[in-house]
Amino acid sequence: MTGPLAAARSVAATKSMTAPTVDERPDIKKGLAGVVVDTTAISKVVPQTNSLTYRGYPVQDLAARCSFEQVAFLLWRGELPTDAELALFSQRERASRRVDRSMLSLLAKLPDNCHPMDVVRTAISYLGAEDPDEDDAAANRAKAMRMMAVLPTIVAIDMRRRRGLPPIAPHSGLGYAQNFLHMCFGEVPETAVVSAFEQSMILYAEHGFNASTFAARVVTSTQSDIYSAVTGAIGALKGRLHGGANEAVMHDMIEIGDPANAREWLRAKLARKEKIMGFGHRVYRHGDSRVPTMKRALERVGTVRDGQRWLDIYQVLAAEMASATGILPNLDFPTGPAYYLMGFDIASFTPIFVMSRITGWTAHIMEQATANALIRPLSAYCGHEQRVLPGTF
């Protein structure tokens, strides 16, 4: 074949064997950075003002004036509860805290070196396997309540198991935060500790389309069940680039040991271009609005738990990072030492995060199910073009 048609085919064949040029490729957003994939009425992050609201309320105001139960109701229902609604909500939460013998047996059989996040993920899968209810909206609200109520019991059992201690049963006469602390330590600690813990739970409860929340919405978009969506979210949160930062913060502070070492430790890290955990945020560019509330909570806990050393290390690192890089702390930076002073094992910090974020995850799961569309993005192929299989290989 000769002439213009043959020439055109020759050019086409040549192009098919080469990767597309930059101009020919679509606009790829690695990590979906800057991509708006849906609407949500649950929370709003405004990077320009470093603000975060839940259903329109500033999170720092909620942390200062509300209980975690009130915030959970707000995230799920869209409005703060009346006194009567809160009483009924709390009654149902307290009635749902216990785990049965089969769950206790399952937790006891898990290896001692099992990652605490694997314990939480396995427990949620088991709850889903034994739940006979349908997956309609009303049932999902009840399932969300069950997970919120039972997760503290599971996390406390696992932490005590690792310490060689027997579990402590939930106390129906105590509020959410007091009950969890009692199940962990056998007593209700100082008011400053209870208050700081509850505030941390409110501050961690929800944060838009982060990786774990988006994972939950992706699973939900396939019309899978709520437990599968939460399990997917837990798997995402286990990853080092999403959860675990408050654990890393505390490991770093322990490595520093003395406030006098903090400045040189940080300078050496920066010289090696290593990431400093607890600083910076992909969304907030000029500071995390949750930090001042949690820093004050850390200071209160430090006062009653002899935590001046960690407060001093915090101050040195924060000041030096701001001076050297302009990067400010995120919520994980004050939460790490706060949880450590409360007495929690470092390995349990991220499971505690799950206890909080279960409210935000399930709010998003229910919102996704209400106006669902299968989440199915496209990809740009960059491998070999179609090839002929050789006769022998």
From Swiss-Prot:
InterPro entries: 2-MeCitrate/Citrate_synth_II (IPR011278), Citrate_synth-like_lrg_a-sub (IPR016142), Citrate_synth-like_sm_a-sub (IPR016143), Citrate_synthase (IPR002020), Citrate_synthase_AS (IPR019810), Citrate_synthase_bac-typ (IPR024176), Citrate_synthase_sf (IPR036969). It catalyses: propanoyl-CoA + oxaloacetate + H2O = (2S,3S)-2-methylcitrate + CoA + H(+); oxaloacetate + acetyl-CoA + H2O = citrate + CoA + H(+). Its EC number is 2.3.3.5, 2.3.3.16. Pathway: Organic acid metabolism; propanoate degradation; Carbohydrate metabolism; tricarboxylic acid cycle; isocitrate from oxaloacetate: step 1/2. Induction: Activated by PrpR. Substrate binds at R92, H207, R290, R357, R376. It holds the Pfam family Citrate_synt. The active site is at H242, H281, D332. GO terms for biological process: carbohydrate metabolic process; propionate metabolic process, methylcitrate cycle; tricarboxylic acid cycle. Keywords: Transferase, Tricarboxylic acid cycle. The vitamin B12 restores growth of the prpDC mutant. It suggests the capacity of the MCM-dependent methylmalonyl pathway to support the metabolism of propionate independently of the methylcitrate cycle. Homodimer. This is 2-methylcitrate synthase.
